[in-house]
Amino acid sequence: MKLLVVGSGGREHAIAKKLLESKDVEKVFVAPGNDGMTLDGLELVNISISEHSKLIDFAKTNDVAWTFIGPDDALAAGIVDDFNQAGLKAFGPTRAAAELEWSKDFAKEIMVKYGVSTAAYGTFSDFEEAKAYIEKHGAPIVVKADGLALGKGVVVAETVEQAVEAAHEMLLDNKFGDSGARVVIEEFLEGEEFSLFAFVNGDKFYIMPTAQDHKRAYDGDKGPNTGGMGAYAPVPHLPQSVVDTAVDTIVKPVLEGIIKEGRPYLGVIYAGLILTADGPKVIEFNSRFGDPETQIILPRLTSDFAQNITDILDGKEPNIMWTDKGVTLGVVVASKGYPLDYERGVELPAKTEGDVITYYAGAKFAENSRALLSNGGRVYMLVTTADTVKEAQASIYQELSQQKIEGLFYRTDIGSKAIK
């Protein structure tokens, strides 16, 4: 069968590469993809994620069995609704179900209504009211754009002044456009963060290995928030009992709640959680695979990925299997200046071979050669699996030390939290 993946980043590279490994898959198209993906035999389609009718026409013309939707903004724009209306199968939630991600206020309302543990909060569209709330509650405090902001719409403010400035930028300076026209301001939760993903169809869900992302740009969790600078899975120091509690008290009630709201969920759900002294609590929900977590979770899948998704789409019980070997760790290489202004056009090192996988996020061929150049904030990610976090770290950082990456940067401490 032929499949289509919608999106262009490292997440979509990992999804498409894994699908192509399946025995019944002859071709995987990626729209629009990036040039680095072609090194893994993936076929790029020059259609933007916002051009739903063109994507639908392409899927029909090329006998695509089903389409996997990668990015949040495509889901928020109702791409799954449009595919379904055209009689095509797409793996991802409808616009209504995806509101769990594209409106933080809606997600909070669902959590409160169905008794899911999360931070105390207030939602504001008026700056003076937001400012008064911040001054009343003090710092540290968290200010979030209500809508989608490429993973950069969250400010963990350590002072009242910083929080007020963040609210001002979103509500009055229009920093994130309509996405920041409302802000959710919530209490700062202390604890260790982790990510929990599941494949979902209605009230049936299948949990994936836990993962830990590294959001800040620089070592020691310093600098601005990014889309993610590296991750590892599973989280070895996280007890299974915590995962079980999170499934029973967070994932299950939210999925049951969203059915009761008339918005049944199909696709991948991603719970960004924090283990507090009072147990796991929700930081956020996302309505799709995470980036960079996808790149370190999917290499751990030992079953046939395309068959698993086909079964879920058809309402059958999928036979999903994961390796229990060690840990999978990945480090993102980004353009200098990311997540703010950055340059493009830096020549990239050759694709890795053997045990270290390269997933490309922002790469394009030079005009007159097959040299790959940087073409985005996050450029590529190196991923490997080893018996321990320490061994995986050593392998990745050894590889990176040999790569010529002037004009690019990476964090040198991915996974260090797991080494006690």
Swiss-Prot record:
GO-annotated molecular function: ATP binding; metal ion binding; phosphoribosylamine-glycine ligase activity
Enzyme class: ligase
Binding site for ATP: 134-195
Residues where Mg(2+) binds: 284, 286
Pathway membership: Purine metabolism; IMP biosynthesis via de novo pathway; N(1)-(5-phospho-D-ribosyl)glycinamide from 5-phospho-alpha-D-ribose 1-diphosphate: step 2/2
Catalytic activity field: 5-phospho-beta-D-ribosylamine + glycine + ATP = N(1)-(5-phospho-beta-D-ribosyl)glycinamide + ADP + phosphate + H(+)
Pfam families xref list: GARS_A (PF01071), GARS_C (PF02843), GARS_N (PF02844)
EC number assigned by the record: 6.3.4.13
Domain (ATP-grasp): residue spans on this chain: 108-314
Protein name (Swiss-Prot/TrEMBL): Phosphoribosylamine--glycine ligase
Species per Swiss-Prot/TrEMBL record: Streptococcus pneumoniae (strain ATCC BAA-255 / R6)
